[in-house]
C-alpha cells in the first residue's frame, strides 16, 4: 500500500482530467496537495471535493515569473507533478512560429523552470520526487502535432538529464507517457474515429485518468526509490518500447 502521509505534492494542470485524478489520488494516499492551474473555478470545485489538506494556487505557466513564484512560495515540497500542457495542432507547413513557440514555452520551458526551482528546494532536504507527464506521441510522433510532439519528447530528454544531476541528492526524476486516455477530447470523436483508435490498442479500450494517476502515485512513493530517469508508458500496449 502506498502511503504519502506527511508529504506535500504540487500538481500543475490539476483542474480537470489527468491532473485532477492525480491530485485526488495523492490526497487519498495521505499527501497534502497543492493544486495549480489557470482556471480558479475548476480548482475550487476540486478543492470542495477534497474537503481538506489542500491549497489552491492559480498560475499562468506562460508567465515565467509566475512559474518561479509557484515554487518559491511553497514552504515544503516533496513531490512535483508537472502535468499542465497545451496543444496548437496543424500540419507543419501551415504552422506559424508563434504556434510552435507557445507550445514549447508552456509544455517544455515552463516545466523546466518548475523542475529547476523544485530541485533547489529538494536538495536542501535531500529528498524529492519529480514526475513529468509526457505523452505517447513524444516517442511515436503524430501528424499535425510537430510542436506538441517536440515538447513531449523534450520532457523525456530533460527528465533523463536532470535525473543524472540530482541522483546523489535523494531526488528521483521520472516521466509518465500516457496513451489515449478518456477525456473531453475523446468524447468528441465520432464512433468511427473511436473504433479506429481502439483497434490500435492491444488491450482494446481507452485508458482512464486514474490509470495515469496510479502510475504517478507509484513513482511518487518510496516503493519507487530505486527508479529514476525512466519513462513509464501507460498506453494499453499501443506503443511497446
Curated annotation (Swiss-Prot):
<keyword id="KW-0560">Oxidoreductase</keyword>
<comment type="function">
    <text>Catalyzes the NADPH-dependent reduction of beta-ketoacyl-ACP substrates to beta-hydroxyacyl-ACP products, the first reductive step in the elongation cycle of fatty acid biosynthesis.</text>
</comment>
<protein>
    <recommendedName>
        <fullName>3-oxoacyl-[acyl-carrier-protein] reductase FabG</fullName>
        <ecNumber>1.1.1.100</ecNumber>
    </recommendedName>
</protein>
<dbReference type="InterPro" id="IPR011284">
    <property type="entry name" value="3oxo_ACP_reduc"/>
</dbReference>
<keyword id="KW-0521">NADP</keyword>
<comment type="pathway">
    <text>Lipid metabolism; fatty acid biosynthesis.</text>
</comment>
<dbReference type="InterPro" id="IPR050259">
    <property type="entry name" value="SDR"/>
</dbReference>
<comment type="similarity">
    <text>Belongs to the short-chain dehydrogenases/reductases (SDR) family.</text>
</comment>
<comment type="subunit">
    <text>Homotetramer.</text>
</comment>
<dbReference type="InterPro" id="IPR036291">
    <property type="entry name" value="NAD(P)-bd_dom_sf"/>
</dbReference>
<keyword id="KW-0443">Lipid metabolism</keyword>
<dbReference type="GO" id="GO:0004316">
    <property type="term" value="F:3-oxoacyl-[acyl-carrier-protein] reductase (NADPH) activity"/>
</dbReference>
<feature type="binding site">
    <location>
        <position position="135"/>
    </location>
    <ligand>
        <name>substrate</name>
    </ligand>
</feature>
<keyword id="KW-0276">Fatty acid metabolism</keyword>
<keyword id="KW-0444">Lipid biosynthesis</keyword>
<feature type="binding site">
    <location>
        <begin position="57"/>
        <end position="58"/>
    </location>
    <ligand>
        <name>NADP(+)</name>
    </ligand>
</feature>
<feature type="binding site">
    <location>
        <begin position="148"/>
        <end position="152"/>
    </location>
    <ligand>
        <name>NADP(+)</name>
    </ligand>
</feature>
<feature type="binding site">
    <location>
        <position position="38"/>
    </location>
    <ligand>
        <name>NADP(+)</name>
    </ligand>
</feature>
<dbReference type="GO" id="GO:0051287">
    <property type="term" value="F:NAD binding"/>
</dbReference>
<dbReference type="InterPro" id="IPR002347">
    <property type="entry name" value="SDR_fam"/>
</dbReference>
<dbReference type="InterPro" id="IPR020904">
    <property type="entry name" value="Sc_DH/Rdtase_CS"/>
</dbReference>
<dbReference type="Pfam" id="PF13561">
    <property type="entry name" value="adh_short_C2"/>
</dbReference>
<dbReference type="GO" id="GO:0050661">
    <property type="term" value="F:NADP binding"/>
</dbReference>
<dbReference type="GO" id="GO:0030497">
    <property type="term" value="P:fatty acid elongation"/>
</dbReference>
<feature type="binding site">
    <location>
        <position position="181"/>
    </location>
    <ligand>
        <name>NADP(+)</name>
    </ligand>
</feature>
<feature type="active site" description="Proton acceptor">
    <location>
        <position position="148"/>
    </location>
</feature>
<feature type="binding site">
    <location>
        <position position="83"/>
    </location>
    <ligand>
        <name>NADP(+)</name>
    </ligand>
</feature>
<keyword id="KW-0275">Fatty acid biosynthesis</keyword>
<feature type="binding site">
    <location>
        <begin position="13"/>
        <end position="16"/>
    </location>
    <ligand>
        <name>NADP(+)</name>
    </ligand>
</feature>
Amino acid at each position: 500500500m502506498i502511503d504519502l502521509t506527511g508529504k506535500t505534492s504540487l500538481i500543475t494542470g490539476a483542474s480537470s482530467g489527468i491532473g485532477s485524478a492525480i491530485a485526488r489520488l495523492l490526497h487519498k494516499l495521505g499527501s497534502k496537495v497543492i493544486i495549480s492551474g489557470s482556471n480558479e473555478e475548476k480548482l475550487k470545485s476540486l478543492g470542495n471535493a477534497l474537503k481538506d489538506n489542500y491549497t489552491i494556487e492559480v498560475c499562468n505557466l506562460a508567465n515565467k515569473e509566475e512559474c518561479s513564484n509557484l515554487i518559491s512560495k511553497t514552504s515544503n515540497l516533496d513531490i512535483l507533478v508537472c502535468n499542465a500542457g497545451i496543444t496548437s495542432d496543424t500540419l507543419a507547413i501551415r504552422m506559424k512560429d508563434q504556434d510552435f513557440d507557445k507550445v514549447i514555452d508552456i509544455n517544455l520551458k515552463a516545466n523546466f523552470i518548475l523542475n529547476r526551482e523544485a530541485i533547489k528546494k529538494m536538495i536542501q532536504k535531500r529528498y524529492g520526487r519529480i514526475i513529468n507527464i509526457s505523452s505517447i506521441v513524444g516517442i511515436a510522433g503524430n501528424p499535425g502535432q510537430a510542436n506538441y510532439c517536440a515538447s513531449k519528447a523534450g520532457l523525456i530528454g530533460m527528465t533523463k538529464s536532470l535525473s543524472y544531476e540530482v541522483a546523489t541528492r535523494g531526488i528521483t526524476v521520472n516521466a509518465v507517457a500516457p496513451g489515449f486516455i478518456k477525456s473531453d477530447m475523446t468524447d468528441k470523436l465520432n464512433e468511427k474515429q473511436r473504433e479506429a483508435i481502439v483497434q490500435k490498442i492491444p488491450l482494446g479500450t481507452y485508458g482512464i485518468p486514474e490509470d495515469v494517476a496510479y502510475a504517478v502515485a507509484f513513482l511518487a512513493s518510496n516503493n519507487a526509490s530505486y527508479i529514476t530517469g525512466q519513462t513509464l508508458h501507460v498506453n494499453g500496449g499501443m506503443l511497446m518500447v
